[in-house]
């Protein structure tokens, strides 16, 4: 295939020299200067290189060269005659000039100052380049002064604004924002500024060829709506390629051919243009032409393989011949070999259209059939401002076109996912229309949620395209969606926030703005908070963190009421690992926003306490303890001060409430439950029973004949109350119990328990005989401790025997006593004991301190003792162990007695 560009034949050097000499003799210096300044197009591009001349001469015969020389000689003579005629018309010789012309010239010279003044008075806006820089304030003032929109000044300003906006948008385009740039570009009148658009696209592509695929996609979208703009860009591209080929400008050929290749991939240009360009480049192969052809073939080779396999086979066959026959550089030979390897791999590294740029359907695209060798008008006049007498009419026409295109684009984006169901929708609409004609009303319920999907997509695009939350809120409110979609909008804001890698304050501010604007948004976010907390286990950790931080922001700014925390109930049963993580991040974020003092004050607000009952539970000590441990573990222990006080005061409150409960309940089940609760309250101080029992036995030695049940109740009280604190209330309690015990003793003496007493005396005597061996070494210790007045544990060892005797008495009397009387006595003793348990428990801390002090004194004393003292100390340890074992046996017997009393046989 031969193009018109390749049909230019060079002439001989001798003819050139003759013509040049004759021309120089006949022409003046001014004419020669004009000829040098003339463009290559006027000279018909005769400055070919010697290598091209040799290549053209190599394949032609002598006859054909002679014919071509004669033709060139004739053409040159004709051209010289034309130039001489033009020169004679424009600049006649001085002798031929008329005197009238000289007179007119002198008069025009006199009028020059006046014309200069007129030029100086021109408006800077009307100059070709827009004039000097005008400050924005002055420019706005000048625009306000212009009232006639059809005036020249207004059209000039709108032209300059159009040029700036088109250049800015073209320079900003990339793969990610191409859809947004297209929408903004269509807002401008690109029909009026199509020359500016074409020039901007070509300049941007030549400056950055790496983004050629992006510019090609942009041109493809514009071509689908305005085919004349795509045709203009393609014409200018072809002319640029031909210009670069004639000038041997490799860089211009590379950029232009690459752009053409991508336009062919986008179906803007036909594949015939590609084959013509490749044929031209490989017809007379040089290193540069082969390199341009290979680069061009890489970009559009896969497309040519699909649409024209015979054509691409011919191109590769030509490359193979060049590789074997032509004398080209090694680098170019290697490039040809690489090209064959790329073809063998199926052009896998050079796809037709990159992902994200296939934005136009094949049916919507308009393909231009523009051959390479035709003459095209680049329409450069479109690049320059020209006044339009019908300016406002054309603007209104473009507004109508723009509205149609943008509305069509919105419907296309909404129907991308439901393209398959479009026919069904049309059938349903037809059926609905027929039924309406018959007079029947039919309601169609859409179960596919197509409208919901399109609504969510619209919101997502609005959020992602906004720079700040105020702009986003303005865009969303401008959509004017129905009130039924309010909650869906709030859900979409939360979902967008959860999808981010890290929490962005943008979403918290956006949600807060909507909550402040309308009550419905606030109620929607309240419901979403409860739903999210109930289903928080479905979220990943990253999404959970973002959701918690967003809701913390809403509560901190008081966009949401704090009553939403009512749904949070802290306990081991009602929480999961996900909900605990949510509460942890939520409160840590609140503490970071507000500070611990303000957060604590808000949680102590009396008006909000009903909503914090689940968050700070006080109904059950177990839940209270769980909440305290939870907040302490997350570093917010300062929020649990009141819970700790409540947990300390809980036993006192329970003890104060139980006597009233016992008076109201008369059933045996209520009495047994009250006794079990009192026993559970007294079980906290069982660890100190050994010390308290020894002291109680020494003080109550005169009441050794007291009944078993009364002594047991007294021992329980003394176990709780004895310590280093000798308060008056405890003394009064002991005296009252002693009097009650004596009365009970007198009653029981009437019944007579002679046998139990004799057995008790025998056992006590045996016990004393067994312990008599240790009295010799126990005396000096007691003497030493009595002199020093140190309350240590060794002072109590001498009382162990008496305590054991009394405990044996209690066990025997419990075995043979009347169970009915025992239950009555227990009720009385329990009611009295429960009144003072809250007072007696206060002394436990003091007893612990005293025991620690006594142990320290024992350690100091044991360090200074001799070997004999160490032996005695070992004996004391043995006695201590025996006392522990005896106490354990006593406790087990007591438990057995209690079980017998609670058994149904005993109650009957």
UniProtKB/Swiss-Prot annotation:
Annotated ranges, domain MIF4G: 163-346
Cellular localization per UniProt: Nucleus; Nucleus speckle
InterPro entries noted in UniProt: ARM-type_fold (IPR016024), CWC22_splicing_factor (IPR050781), Initiation_fac_eIF4g_MI (IPR003891), MIF4G-like_typ-3 (IPR003890)
Record has Phosphoprotein as a keyword: yes
Organism: Homo sapiens (Human)
Keywords: mRNA processing, mRNA splicing, Nucleus, Phosphoprotein, Spliceosome
Domain of life: Eukaryota
Homology family: Belongs to the CWC22 family.
Chief location bin: nucleus
Database matches in Pfam families: MA3 (PF02847), MIF4G (PF02854)
One of the GO BP terms on file: mRNA splicing, via spliceosome
Regions of compositional bias (Polar residues) in chain numbering: 1-10, 100-110
Name of this protein: Pre-mRNA-splicing factor CWC22 homolog
Signal peptide: none
Bias type Low complexity, positions: 666-680, 703-714
Ranges of Basic and acidic residues composition bias in the record: 28-56, 66-85, 113-122, 726-770, 801-817, 826-908
Classification via SUPFAM superfamilies: ARM repeat (SSF48371)
Keyword Manganese: no
Single GO MF annotation: RNA binding
Impact when changing residue 334 to A: Decreased EIF4A3-binding
Biased composition (Acidic residues): 407-438
Annotated GO CC locations: catalytic step 2 spliceosome; cytosol; nuclear speck; nucleoplasm; nucleus; spliceosomal complex; U2-type catalytic step 1 spliceosome; U2-type catalytic step 2 spliceosome
Phosphoserine PTM sites in chain numbering: 39, 61, 107, 786, 829
Disordered as annotated region, ranges: 1-129, 404-443, 654-908
Task of the protein: Required for pre-mRNA splicing as component of the spliceosome. As a component of the minor spliceosome, involved in the splicing of U12-type introns in pre-mRNAs. Promotes exon-junction complex (EJC) assembly. Hinders EIF4A3 from non-specifically binding RNA and escorts it to the splicing machinery to promote EJC assembly on mature mRNAs. Through its role in EJC assembly, required for nonsense-mediated mRNA decay.
Domain MI: 454-570
Subunit annotation: Component of the pre-catalytic spliceosome B and the catalytic spliceosome C complexes. Component of the minor spliceosome, which splices U12-type introns. Interacts with EIF4A3 and PRPF19 in an RNA-independent manner. Direct interaction with EIF4A3 is mediated by the MIF4G domain. Full interaction with EIF4A3 occurs only when EIF4A3 is not part of the EJC and prevents EIF4A3 binding to RNA.
């Amino acid at each position: 295939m031969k193009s018109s560009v390749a049909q230019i034949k060079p002439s001989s050097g001798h003819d050139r020299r003759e013509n040049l000499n004759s021309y120089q003799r006949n022409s003046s210096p001014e004419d020669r200067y004009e000829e040098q300044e003339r463009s290559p197009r006027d000279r018909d591009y005769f400055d070919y290189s010697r290598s091209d001349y040799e290549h053209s001469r190599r394949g032609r015969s002598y006859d054909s060269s002679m014919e071509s020389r004669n033709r060139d000689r004739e053409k040159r003579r004709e051209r010289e005659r034309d130039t001489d005629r033009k020169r004679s018309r424009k600049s006649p010789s001085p002798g031929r000039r008329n005197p009238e012309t000289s007179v007119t010239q002198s008069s025009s010279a006199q009028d020059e100052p006046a014309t200069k003044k007129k030029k100086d008075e021109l408006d800077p806006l009307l100059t070709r380049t827009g004039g000097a820089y005008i400050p924005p304030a002055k420019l706005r003032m000048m625009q306000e002064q212009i009232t006639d929109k059809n005036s020249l000044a207004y059209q000039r300003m709108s032209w300059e604004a159009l040029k700036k906006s088109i250049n800015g948008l073209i320079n900003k385009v990339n793969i990610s924002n191409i859809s947004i740039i297209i929408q903004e570009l269509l807002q401008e009148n690109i029909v009026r500024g199509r020359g500016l658009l074409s020039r901007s696209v070509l300049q941007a592509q030549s400056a950055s060829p790496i983004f050629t695929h992006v510019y090609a996609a942009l041109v493809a979208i514009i071509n689908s709506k305005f085919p004349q703009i795509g045709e203009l860009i393609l014409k200018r591209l072809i002319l640029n390629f031909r210009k670069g080929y004639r000038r041997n400008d490799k860089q211009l050929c590379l950029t232009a051919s690459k752009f053409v290749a991508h336009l062919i991939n986008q179906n803007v240009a036909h594949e015939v243009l590609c084959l013509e360009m490749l044929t031209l480049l490989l017809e007379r192969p040089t290193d540069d032409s082969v390199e341009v052809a290979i680069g061009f073939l890489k970009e559009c080779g896969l497309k040519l393989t699909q649409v024209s396999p015979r054509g691409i086979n011919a191109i590769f066959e030509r490359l193979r011949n060049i590789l074997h026959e032509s004398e080209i550089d090694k680098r170019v030979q290697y490039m040809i070999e690489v090209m064959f390897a790329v073809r063998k791999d199926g052009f896998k590294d050079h796809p037709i259209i990159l992902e994200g740029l296939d934005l136009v359907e094949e049916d919507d695209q308009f393909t231009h059939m523009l051959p390479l060798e035709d003459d095209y008008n680049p329409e450069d006049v479109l690049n320059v401002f020209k006044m339009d007498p019908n300016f406002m009419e054309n603007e209104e026409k473009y507004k109508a076109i723009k509205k149609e295109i943008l509305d069509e684009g919105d419907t296309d984006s909404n129907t991308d996912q439901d393209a398959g169901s479009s026919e069904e929708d049309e059938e349903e609409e037809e059926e609905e229309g027929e039924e309406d004609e018959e007079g029947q009303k039919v309601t169609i319920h859409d179960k596919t949620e197509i409208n919901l999907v399109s609504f969510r997509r619209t919101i997502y695009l609005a959020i992602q395209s906004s720079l700040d939350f105020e702009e986003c809120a303005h865009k969303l409110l401008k959509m004017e969606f129905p009130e039924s979609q309010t909650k869906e909008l709030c859900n979409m804001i939360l979902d967008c926030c959860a999808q981010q890698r890290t929490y962005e304050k943008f979403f918290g501010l956006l949600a807060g703005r909507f909550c402040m604007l309308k009550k419905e948004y606030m109620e929607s976010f309240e419901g979403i908070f409860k739903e999210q907390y109930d289903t928080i286990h479905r979220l990943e950790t990253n999404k959970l963190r973002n959701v918690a931080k967003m809701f913390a922001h809403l509560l901190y700014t008081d966009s949401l009421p704090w009553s939403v925390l009512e749904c949070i109930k802290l306990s081991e049963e009602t929480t999961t690992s996900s909900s605990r993580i949510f509460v942890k991040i939520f409160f840590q974020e609140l503490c970071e926003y507000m500070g611990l003092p303000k957060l604590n004050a808000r949680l102590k607000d009396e008006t909000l306490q009903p909503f914090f009952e689940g968050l700070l539970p006080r109904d059950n000590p177990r839940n209270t303890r769980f909440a305290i441990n939870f907040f302490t573990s997350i570093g917010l222990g300062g929020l649990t001060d009141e819970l700790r006080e409540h947990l300390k005061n809980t036993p006192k409150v329970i003890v104060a409430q139980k006597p009233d409960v016992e008076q109201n309940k008369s059933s045996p089940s209520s009495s047994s439950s009250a006794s079990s609760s009192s026993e559970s309250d007294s079980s906290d101080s069982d660890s100190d029973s050994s010390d308290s029992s020894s002291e109680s036995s020494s003080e109550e030695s005169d009441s050794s004949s007291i009944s078993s049940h009364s002594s047991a109740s007294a021992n329980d009280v003394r176990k709780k109350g004895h310590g280093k604190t000798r308060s008056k209330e405890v003394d009064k309690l002991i005296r009252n119990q002693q009097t009650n015990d004596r009365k009970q003793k007198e009653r029981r003496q009437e019944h007579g328990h002679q046998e139990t007493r004799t057995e008790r005396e025998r056992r006590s005597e045996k016990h004393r005989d067994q312990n008599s061996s240790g009295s010799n070494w126990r005396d000096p210790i007691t003497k030493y401790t009595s002199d020093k007045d140190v309350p240590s544990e060794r002072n109590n060892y001498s009382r162990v025997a008496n305590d054991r005797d009394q405990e044996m008495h209690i066990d025997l009397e419990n075995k043979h006593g009347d169970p009915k009387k025992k239950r009555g006595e227990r009720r009385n003793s329990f009611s009295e004991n429960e009144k003072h348990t809250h007072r007696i428990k206060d002394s436990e801390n003091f007893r612990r301190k005293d025991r620690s002090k006594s142990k320290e004194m024992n350690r100091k004393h044991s360090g200074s003792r001799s070997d004999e003292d160490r032996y005695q100390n070992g004996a004391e340890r043995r006695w201590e162990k025996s006392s522990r074992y005896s106490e354990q046996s006593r406790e087990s017997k007591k438990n057995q007695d209690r079980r017998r009393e609670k058994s149904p046989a005993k109650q009957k």
